């Protein structure tokens, strides 16, 4: 397992390109160095687009605020709608100054990217390319 450190700032990732080998397992250590809540999500572009309405729903229900996550509301809403728990193996949602981890095995040739699907962030380019070496 190789470790890659990712820093999230307000609307960009560092590094902006992640180079992996097919079949490689990566431990991503992600820190949110911005002033806003950000998401680190590994998926195809199509999957990100499909996930964005769920994220908008979290904003509408005041679970996802600009600079924090209302974890109590999140737990309550998750009882009615499991997508509100935001407990996906391919993603982590972080408040400012928080750190999270994801371990991911890259075993397909699917074109993946990392993106933040907090409403408005993907649209302004908060995306990092994943390239196979």
Where are these regions (language model features)?
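N-terminal edge beta-strand
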Residues: 1-26, 83
